[in-house]
Amino acid sequence: MQPQNLPPRDDPVTAAALAARAGDPAAAARFVRATQADVWRLCAHLGDPGEAQDLAQETYLRAFRALPAFAARSGARTWLLAIARRVCADAVRERRRRPRLDLTADLPDAPGQGADLGDGLALRQAVAALHPDRRDAFVLTQLVGLSYPEAAEVCGCPIGTIRSRVARARADLVGGLAERRLSAPGAG
C-alpha cells in the first residue's frame, strides 16, 4: 500500500512502474514483485479463486500494454488494482455467459475437514453474494488493505461512498452468515 504522505512519483512502486515504462526490465520485475500479492488477492476475491492466477496474469498483460499511457497521476498500485478490478468484472460477465458444471458437488468431504473449512467456505460464499459495489469496496479495503482514498480511486467514486459500501457489506456479511448458521442442518 502506498504510504499516505508520499506523492505518487516518490512511491517506490510508482517509481518502478515509471522506470519500466522507460524500458527498464529490472524495474518491471520489481513492479510485479511489489504488487503481485495484492493483485492475486483481489482477483481471488472478486473473481473465481480457481482462476485467480489467470486473472492476475491478464491484469499484468493489460497493465504492461497500458504502461506507456501511465502518467502517475495516482499511485501505480492504485492504477494496477483498477485494471485488476476490470479484469475480474470481465471474467464474471464471461462466466455468466458460459455456465460451468460443478464436478466436485457430489464428492464427500476429506477426513479432517472440519468447521474451519466450512466457515471459510461460508465466508467466501457470503462475500461472493454481496452486491458487486459493496464486494469491491470490502475486498479492496479489508482484504487487500487499501486505504479508503485508494479504494475510492480504484472504484472511481467518493471516499464517503466507499465508507458506506464497506459498512453495508459488513452488515450484509454478518446477517448472511447468521442466516446460514440458522439454516444449516442440525442448527438449533
Residue locations for each model-derived region?
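Short, charged helix-capping/linker segments at alpha-helix termini
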Residues: P3-Q4, R21-R30, W40-E58
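Amphipathic, Lys/Arg- and hydrophobic-enriched alpha-helical face
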Residues: V32-P49, A66, V127, E179
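Structural recognition of an alpha-helix C-terminal capping motif at a helix-to-coil junction
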Residues: D54-L61, S74-R86
